[in-house]
A protein has these predicted regions:
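SF2 helicase catalytic motif II
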Residues: 104, 112-153
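Non-catalytic terminal extensions of ATP-dependent helicases
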Residues: 310, 329-333, 412-766
Length: 766
């Protein structure tokens, strides 16, 4: 096929032409390229190609915000040919092009394969999320359970082992998967390093640090700590002087993004009077439309935006985030403080990117950034067709990273993509009910972790075989064809134990006593053991081996064989473990589900049937259902219980608790808390109920205004809206899973109480 070098007025790069050629040839494809290089253009070409036929295509993304953005983009181009399905949002679910989160696609592939039987292509955006500790399993299961007829377009940031990823996908779907790896950026990056209030090239930083290492690299350097408080001002001022704005300033804390944005706006001003008037009108319109007059966040953000400064993170209301995105895209904002989700969820590059720190909290502990994370965020620097160079400002903070660690992070190799496969109870139940035992074994062998482990299997197999041969070679062979060597060795070990015991006691006497007493005790010990020893010597003569001149040689060879046998057992165990990594985990979870009454030898019991349809806290939801809480509680109480199931308390983000309000919780909610928390003490995989925020849901469900809700808590507005929308998702899961019409109708009412006003208005924004 002859291809034009332009698509939608864009001149295609060579890697894009290669990718489109592979698509036209009907191949699946792994496309690895730097952030901002134009991978999405290939996906858009594929969607347009499929929409010209009667086939269907599914586009998956890692986060709802990105799904919503893609839905808005594609629906503007293709109208009602596009739909979206993200759990809490369902629009035109049977559309020819369906935009979904990866979790939704995985659920369809496992539970309702008929729904995707006519899908010809699936696009996996950000497939490197497969290496995410919390969510990576979803990507693997999505690929494993996809129809064999489907073709994949897997888009990834730069990863070194994309060939290995492609070979694994190829082994799962049984057809060829091509690889295109493009490492050249459309706009090259240049790194600057912040140190001692100035920006340096790397070679100059090296001289500076080595010249004053003793002065500046102490772990508790007070000067560094004070410098950190004003780091953002120094960086912004110098980039402004060098005409390197707009700037995306990345921080790993929402609270810090809020603080730095407001501080900067109160000390710096980047906008003209005309820009201020326009920004003010846009913000006022947003505040009026969504009734945000009394929200401190909205008023502070207005002050910041009017001076050309902003912030963007998940704690902001989606309506305010959208306003920030519009102003940044129009180049009205010069400095934007963002968290790392901006690098994934929003395709908005800038001339410069800066980091406030290089350590992050990952939900478990503080750790240095990984090279892949650093590369993806840094990739937001440099706008194609606008900038000749993208600038990345990296702080040198010795208490966080040594100079060598800093050098490796910026200039070192990116980590390989590693599998994080871990079966959920939902997956175990669906495997158990839908497949025979041997089929399950085969499925469990198809994950990426097993594929990576299989690389070692030939080496392990060879090692085991060599050890077996070596044991056979050294094992004693009696030239006299005597048959009592095994019995003799049991006797020999008993004799050795007695002699060892005697030796230890003699040693204790020698080191513990001196003079005449020592000699007396020594004589007593010798007498104590002499009789036993004489008896053993007599027994030794009864063995043919005991009288043989080859005895010492046979004993030596036997001991050598025993040592080799220990090695063999170790490597054989490792080989068995590597050969079926997931089967033991699957069997342990099956046994637990059997004890809990979810399965029997025939299949799923009623509890298992329900849990197999729930993807959020499935065991807790199932137990609440079978103990009558969804039936007996009011709609408002059901909503509050669901919120307590899904809410994740964030560090330093507020807990939402009002002691008096929490104490007034309805008895049914207190009862549910006691019930689930009792289960959680028995089973660590069950999360205790977070009831400190239940009063917020009850008030909202009963019709309170959002401003009144926010006056009751310190939880960020965006977090609370997102939690409410997650409850909507969970309620829909439960409604689809239960059979009683009366309960289904009740859950529909629950949804209506939540999905109103500002929560409804965020449906396609968050």
């Amino acid at each position: 096929m002859e291809l034009n070098v332009k698509y939608r007025d864009y001149i295609l790069d060579e890697f894009q032409i290669q990718a489109i050629t592979e698509i036209e040839n009907g191949h699946s494809l792994v496309l690895s390229a730097p952030t901002g290089s134009g991978k999405t253009l290939v996906a858009e070409y594929l969607i347009e190609k499929v929409l010209k036929t009667d086939q269907r295509i599914i586009y998956t993304s890692p986060i709802k915000a990105l799904s919503n953005q893609k839905y808005r983009d594609f629906s503007r181009l293709y109208g009602d040919k596009v739909g979206i399905l993200t759990g809490d949002v369902v629009i035109n679910r049977d559309a020819q092009a369906l935009i979904v989160t990866t979790e939704v696609y995985r659920n369809m592939a496992i539970e309702d394969p008929e729904a995707i039987a006519d899908v010809s292509y699936v696009i996996f955006d950000e497939i490197h999320y497969l290496g995410d500790i919390e969510r990576g399993t979803v990507w693997e299961e999505s690929i494993i359970f996809s129809p064999k007829t489907v073709r994949f377009l897997a888009l990834s940031a730069t990863i070194p082992n994309c060939d290995e990823l492609a070979r694994w996908i190829e082994s799962v779907i049984d057809h060829q998967v091509k690889v295109i790896s493009h490492n050249q950026r459309a706009v090259p990056l240049s790194f600057l390093f912040y140190h001692n209030k100035s920006l340096y090239q790397f070679k100059d930083l090296r001289k500076k640090v080595r010249g004053g290492a003793a002065d500046h690299e102490g772990p508790r350097d007070r000067r560094q700590k004070k410098e950190g408080e004003f780091r953002h001002f120094d960086i912004i001022k110098q980039l402004k002087q060098q005409d390197r704005l707009p700037l995306l300033y990345f921080v790993f804390s929402r609270a810090l993004a809020d603080k730095l944005s407001l501080d900067t706006a109160r000390k710096m001003d980047f906008t003209s009077p005309a820009e201020k008037d326009r920004i003010e009108a846009m913000v006022d319109n947003c505040i009026e439309k969504y009734q945000l007059h009394n929200l401190e966040t909205a008023q502070n953000l207005k002050e910041e935006l009017m001076r050309g400064v902003g912030r963007h993170h998940a704690g902001l209301l989606p309506q305010l985030k959208e306003l920030v995105e519009i102003l940044f895209a129009e180049r009205t904002l010069r400095v934007l403080f963002v968290t790392e989700t901006f690098a994934v969820g929003v395709n908005m590059p800038a001339r410069s990117v800066a980091y406030d720190a290089l350590k992050k909290y990952d939900g478990r502990s503080f750790r240095p950034m990984r090279a892949l994370e650093f590369t993806q965020i840094s990739g937001r620097a440099g706008r194609r067709g606008i900038d000749k160079t993208g600038w990345v400002v990296v702080p040198h903070i010795p208490r966080d990273l040594s100079f060598e660690e800093l050098q490796n992070l910026v200039y070192g190799d990116i980590e390989n993509l590693e599998s994080q496969f871990d079966l959920s109870f939902n997956s175990v139940l669906n495997l158990y009910s839908g497949h025979k035992t041997e089929e399950v074994r085969l499925i469990l062998k198809r994950n990426f972790a097993q594929f990576q482990a299989n690389k070692n299997l030939p080496e392990l197999t060879e090692k085991v075989a060599k050890l077996r041969l070596e044991i056979e070679r050294v094992a004693p062979r009696c030239p006299e064809k005597k048959n009592d060597f095994a019995d003799f060795m049991k006797f020999y070990k008993k004799k050795q134990q007695l002699e060892d015991t005697m030796h230890r006691q003699m040693l204790d006497i020698r080191t513990g006593m001196r003079g005449r007493k020592n000699r007396i005790f020594q004589a007593e010990v010798e007498k104590k053991f002499s009789d036993s020893h004489a008896e053993l010597r007599e027994q030794e003569k009864t063995f043919i081996c005991g009288r043989c001149h080859n005895l010492n040689r046979c004993i030596s060879r036997h001991q050598q064989a025993e040592r080799l046998e220990k090695k063999l057992n170790y490597w054989r165990g490792l080989l068995e473990e590597q050969g079926e990594l997931q089967l033991p985990l699957y069997e342990r979870k099956l046994e637990l589900l059997r004890r809990l009454g979810y399965i029997d030898e025939k299949g799923l019991l009623p509890r298992g049937e329900l849990a197999s349809r729930i993807h959020t806290e499935e065991i807790a939801v199932t137990e609440l259902y079978f103990h009558g809480y969804f039936h007996e509680c009011s709609e408002h109480e059901v909503n509050a219980i669901c919120l307590s199931l899904i809410y994740e308390h964030r560090r330093r983000a507020g807990n939402g608790e009002q002691p008096r309000a929490a104490a007034k919780l309805p008895e049914k909610i207190k009862s549910a808390r006691g019930f689930i928390n009792s289960l959680a003490r028995q089973h660590p995989f069950i999360k205790p109920l977070e009831t400190r925020i239940c009063h917020l849901m009850i008030a909202w469900s009963e019709g309170a205004a959002f401003e009144d809700i926010m006056s009751m808590t310190d939880i960020p507005e965006g977090d609370l809206i997102r939690a409410f929308r997650q409850v909507i998702d969970l309620l829909r899961q439960i409604r689809d899973a239960v059979k009683e019409m009366s309960l289904r109708d009740k859950l529909l009412s629950c949804l209506a109480y939540i999905n109103r006003d500002i929560v409804l208005a965020t449906e396609l924004r968050d």
